[in-house]
Amino acid sequence: TGLTEGVIDVNTYLPCAGVYKKVTPNPKCWIYPSAHGNLNVSQGIQHSCNDFFYEVGYRLGLNSTGDSKLDNDTSDGKSTQNYYSSERGIAKLQKYAEEFGLGDTSGMEIPESDPQISDDNSVLSAIGQGTNNYTTSQLARYITAVANKGTVYNLSLLDKVTNPKGKTVKDYTPEVKNKVTDVSSTTWQAVHEGMR
């Protein structure tokens, strides 16, 4: 989301100090009391750095004036805090969550819980916290779409149904729900590099 929305690029390095101070209460990286230091997006994914993605969630919530003040911002956000809106960031996160199929059930043939895309706190939601609520099958469909560069499939537990003689009665071929088309090849490359 951050790469596609332009709040970071593949050459952007963001600091992890172990504690993120631009919002209160101050969320912590999983490595706290240590820190990861400066990371690019591939390294942020590789190390699963909370602080990196807290900052992405924060930047998603900035208006254009706030964006222009990032170069002079401090670790506590004094230069940008007046231009931050969690609702603005949440709207962007929700848009991409929907594109990747997280707003719907996975398509399996059994009952499953309805998903909940976070509607609260863009900073925490950027690392999957907030009010997100998904089943493992919904997350599996999402990560499959990330791995295959944007094809979202409806999941199936069945391959085929056969009669007693082994003849196929019904074939369950993979069904494409949608394709995510607004992600650049550079973004896919950076994400996949981080996931290796």
Located regions from the model:
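Beta-lactam-recognizing serine transpeptidase/beta-lactamase-like catalytic domain environment
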Residues: 2-196
